[in-house]
């Protein structure tokens, strides 16, 4: 084999030119043409599901943005060589000029730069489906769209030119409403041929069904070979709340993005930039960030205390030349008093203090103490302040170290740190990194010469104590253009933004489903015995707000074999693939479901039983594991909220199951008593000669039940309804007596409704524990009566009907 290096040695320039000639730019369409699996088009079965998903997501977004309740029609038909997919919506339609770009150009969309919740963002989805269609069938897709109030529809047939990532239009026509294939007066219809199969029918049905759960305001119809699937709109369902676009959050930007923003902003000052380009940043927060930037970029200055025996007035007077002695004394006294009042003071603070004292002295004496005098005074006072650095450093060092450190070790450490400051310059200004280095070197030297150990924790505590003692400098930060050209300075600004507490982003950019709508969606798609839903408060990850919602349906017609059904969603879009790679699955598997009365073999993993568990993550930036957006990444903040939301719904399930178990045991006990009590009553009747005895009253008392009984007078014309509560808590009982003749004399606390020659006497008494309520009315003796009772669990209810 010929050595590549030897070839280069023979003709380096020629090879370089040859290699350079082979290099060329590739378009994004060409890239995804060769890597379509990255977008979820890795097989015919999955490709069909992904194409349906992208088209339906587009339809939902279009209708919702126009304020239209979505009606979406999906049709899949099998041809001789290919499958045909048709997706139609009742949205506002697309303008003629935009149709080719939306469907024939990858990375073309309106949401990429918008920080608000949306199903799609990159502008890849539907155009990727078009690309997959042309790659597998070689046919153009057909798009027909009609805008509101338009008399005609625009029809395009196109493919994507993968070399240029531009639409290649093969046909363009305008048709009248009568000749349009659209079923409504406005909307969009896309028809594509693709190499596919129905082996993923289950995932396709899951997608449609799950989409209906989190979009209860939508009506979706699927027509497929051999059947149909319809998801009707939930009653009283409304459109999701409109979202607002927000600015980026200071905690959510990266360095490159920050530099770009600095270069493009119209603001000159850093304060203006922060307040105009970021959310939740007002004047106070901007000041805090700028101070943190000063700490990062310029460092802090050490504060020193004047020695107790220092004669500051004399020090100031000696530094002033050629001024009236009396006036100088006034100036010196003003400076000395201010320094002592400050307790400890940094060089920059000292300069400001001396300037203020000079102004006050001039007002009092008329003598000017100019910049030269002030500089001399600052230098002289600073020398006095720093004459005993060790004493100033010793205090914080002693407080930060444990009592296990002997005095000699602590003093030795303080002396070495003070020496570092002494050699550091006139301003005693250091960054936090430099301060950490001071402490580290001093600790190493102390350990070496004093045979003492100063651990990492002690060093950090000492550095923290000294840093807290130091003063933020007043230096003005660079302007935005200077920061944009200085990567290190921009990095310092980014660190400052991250270090300051900033209020969480507003949640107006999010549109959660909300617990009541989520429960309505579950009720629409699942016939269960129990439903619960929970919507958490907003939280933040990486500067992006997010909300987690969870819902549970249990029992009823839900399959009880095997594991529970898990439904995962992100921004109202079902995630039907890569369940095992999703953070949602990981979190649910770590929950101890036995605590919630669900079976969980091995104590980990998804529980088993007749249940559906759904989790929805809504965010301006959902962190997916891949470009196909099939699974949510393991972000700790999101995982924590998923667990809390699911546990909130699961607690309601636990309460329901415990109550049902209690009712089941109660019913079993009642059944046993009912097997015994009639026999006992019969024997008692024989012994007493009183004949048969109604055991309903006795059963109600024994079981602490609610007894509802109806009795008629001997002539049959008076009906008495009586409710006795033998329990401890109050109950609201819905009693309905269905009568074949019109009743009379019904009290004000009841009502009569006539329907189809029958009369419904409706009575809803609230009966306290160990109390009773009674209702009496008149009726023809020949009238038939049928008693119906609700509002009380069957296991706690005893009903007795007597003709006389």
Swiss-Prot record:
InterPro entries to which the protein is assigned, alphabetical: HATPase_C_sf (IPR036890), Ribosomal_Su5_D2-typ_SF (IPR020568), Ribsml_uS5_D2-typ_fold_subgr (IPR014721), Top6b_C (IPR040494), TopoVI_B (IPR005734), TopoVI_B_transducer (IPR015320)
Lipoprotein found in the keyword field: no
Keyword ATP-binding assigned: yes
Protein EC: 5.6.2.2
GO BP field: DNA topological change
Cellular component terms per the entry's GO annotation: cytosol; small ribosomal subunit
Function per UniProt: Relaxes both positive and negative superturns and exhibits a strong decatenase activity.
NCBIfam families the record matches: PRK04184.1, PRK14868.1, top6b
Record's protein name: Type 2 DNA topoisomerase 6 subunit B
Organism: Halobacterium salinarum (strain ATCC 700922 / JCM 11081 / NRC-1)
Gene: top6B
């Amino acid at each position: 084999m010929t050595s590549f290096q030897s070839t280069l040695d023979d003709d380096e320039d020629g090879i370089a030119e040859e290699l350079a000639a082979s290099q060329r730019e590739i378009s994004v369409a060409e890239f995804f043409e060769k890597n379509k699996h990255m977008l979820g088009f890795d097989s015919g079965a999955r490709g069909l599901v992904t194409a349906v998903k992208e088209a339906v997501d587009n339809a939902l977004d279009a209708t919702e943005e126009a304020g239209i309740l979505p009606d979406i029609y999906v049709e899949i038909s099998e041809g001789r060589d290919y499958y045909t997919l048709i997706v139609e919506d009742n949205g506002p339609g697309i303008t003629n000029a935009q149709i080719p770009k939306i469907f024939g150009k990858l990375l073309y969309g309106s949401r990429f730069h918008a920080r608000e919740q949306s199903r799609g963002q990159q502008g890849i989805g539907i155009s990727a489906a078009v690309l997959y269609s042309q790659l597998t069938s070689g046919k153009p897709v057909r798009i027909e769209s009609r805008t509101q109030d338009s008399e005609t529809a625009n029809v395009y047939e196109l493919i994507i030119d993968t070399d240029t990532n531009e639409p290649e239009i093969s046909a363009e026509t305008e048709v009248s409403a009568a000749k349009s294939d659209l079923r409504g007066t406005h909307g969009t219809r896309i028809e594509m041929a693709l190499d596919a199969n129905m082996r993923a029918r289950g995932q396709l049905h899951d997608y449609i069904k799950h989409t209906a759960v989190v979009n209860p305001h939508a009506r979706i119809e699927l027509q497929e070979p051999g059947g149909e699937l319809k998801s009707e709109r939930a009653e009283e369902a409304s459109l999701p709340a409109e979202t607002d676009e927000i600015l980026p959050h200071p905690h959510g930007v990266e360095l490159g993005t920050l530099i770009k923003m600095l270069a493009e902003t119209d603001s000159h000052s850093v304060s203006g930039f922060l307040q105009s380009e970021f959310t939740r940043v007002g004047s106070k927060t901007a000041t805090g960030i700028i101070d943190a930037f000063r700490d990062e970029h310029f460092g802090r200055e050490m504060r020193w205390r004047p020695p107790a025996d220092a004669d500051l007035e004399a020090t100031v007077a000696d530094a002033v030349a050629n001024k009236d002695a009396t006036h100088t004394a006034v100036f010196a006294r003003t400076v000395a008093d201010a320094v002592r009042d400050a307790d400890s003071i940094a060089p920059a603070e000292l300069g400001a203090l001396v300037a203020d004292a000079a102004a006050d002295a001039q007002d009092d004496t008329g003598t000017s103490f100019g910049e030269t005098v002030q500089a001399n005074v600052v230098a002289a006072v600073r020398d006095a302040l720093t004459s005993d650095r060790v004493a100033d450093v010793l205090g914080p060092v002693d407080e930060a170290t444990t009592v296990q450190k002997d005095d000699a070790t602590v003093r030795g450490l303080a002396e070495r740190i003070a020496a570092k400051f002494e050699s550091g310059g006139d301003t005693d200004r250091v960054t936090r990194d430099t301060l950490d280095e001071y402490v580290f070197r001093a600790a190493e030297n102390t350990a070496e010469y004093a045979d003492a150990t100063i651990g990492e924790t002690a060093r950090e505590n000492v550095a923290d104590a000294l840093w807290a003692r130091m003063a933020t400098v007043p230096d003005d930060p660079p302007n935005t253009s200077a920061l944009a050209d200085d990567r290190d300075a921009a990095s310092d600004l980014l660190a400052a933004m991250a270090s300051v507490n900033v209020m969480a982003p507003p949640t107006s950019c999010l549109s959660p489903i909300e617990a009541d709508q989520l429960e309505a969606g579950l009720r629409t798609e699942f016939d269960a015995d129990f439903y619960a839903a929970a919507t958490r408060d907003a939280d933040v990850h990486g500067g992006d707000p997010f909300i987690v919602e969870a819902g549970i349906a249990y029992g009823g017609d839900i399959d009880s074999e095997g594991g529970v059904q898990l439904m995962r969603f992100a921004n109202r879009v079902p995630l039907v693939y890569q369940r095992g790679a999703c953070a949602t699955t990981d979190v649910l598997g770590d929950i101890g479901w036995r605590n919630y009365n669900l079976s969980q073999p091995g104590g980990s993993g998804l529980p088993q039983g007749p249940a559906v568990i759904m989790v929805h993550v809504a965010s301006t930036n959902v962190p997916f594991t891949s470009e196909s957006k099939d699974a949510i990444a393991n972000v700790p903040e999101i995982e924590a909220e998923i667990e809390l939301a699911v546990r909130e719904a699961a607690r309601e399930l636990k309460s329901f199951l415990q109550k049902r178990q209690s009712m089941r045991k109660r019913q079993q006990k009642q059944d046993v008593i009912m097997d015994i009590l009639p026999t006992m009553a019969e024997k008692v009747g024989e012994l007493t000669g009183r004949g048969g005895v109604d055991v309903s009253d006795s059963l109600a008392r024994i079981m602490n039940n609610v007894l509802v009984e109806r009795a008629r007078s001997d002539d049959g014309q008076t009906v008495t309804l009586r409710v006795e509560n033998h329990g401890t808590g109050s109950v609201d009982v819905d009693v309905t007596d269905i009568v074949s003749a019109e009743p009379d004399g019904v009290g004000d606390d009841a009502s009569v409704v006539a329907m189809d020659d029958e009369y419904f006497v409706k009575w809803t008494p609230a009966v306290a524990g160990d109390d009773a309520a009674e209702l009496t009315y008149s009726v023809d003796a020949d009238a038939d009566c049928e008693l119906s009772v609700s509002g009380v669990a069957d296991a706690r209810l005893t009903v007795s009907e007597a003709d006389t």
